[in-house]
Amino acid sequence: MRKYRVAGLVAALLVLHSLATPSAQAEAHRAGGEGEEKMSSDGGPVLGGVEPVGNENDLHLVDLARFAVTEHNKKANSLLEFEKLVSVKQQVVAGTLYYFTIEVKEGDAKKLYEAKVWEKPWMDFKELQEFKPVDASANA
């Protein structure tokens, strides 16, 4: 009987621990804004949080940013030209969501756009989720 009582207590403690841990992560997630790095109560990054990548020269990331511009041009019947990848953040989901800030050329003018690309490399899948100009008033 004692063995079952100990097993029951251990199971109860595991349930309580699993209930307490997600709420600490959810609190840390709510504390940060979209696009900011979020930290859990133990100081580590929140799982599923948006994190800076910091390697704008990575060929794979540049290719994904070019893909975003090409897909936008197809959907919007536009003629934007990719210039450079300015910054990139990532979020691990069912695959990876990349948040790009991209410099493009529209005629003679250079402009900044934000793009969100969802990639699942094991399925050879990538999809442009969002493509919009950077709000100039937000940078002022």
Curated annotation (Swiss-Prot):
Entry's Gene Ontology BP terms: defense response
Biotechnology: Introduction by genetic manipulation and expression in potato or banana confers resistance to insects and nematodes.
InterPro entries found in the cross-reference section: Cystatin, Cystatin_dom, Cystatin_sf, Prot_inh_cystat_CS
Compartments, as annotated in UniProt: Secreted
GO molecular-function term, one example from the UniProt record: cysteine-type endopeptidase inhibitor activity
Residue span(s) of domain Cystatin: 48-135
Protein name: Cysteine proteinase inhibitor 1
Species name: Oryza sativa subsp. japonica
Lineage: Eukaryota, Viridiplantae, Streptophyta, Embryophyta, Tracheophyta
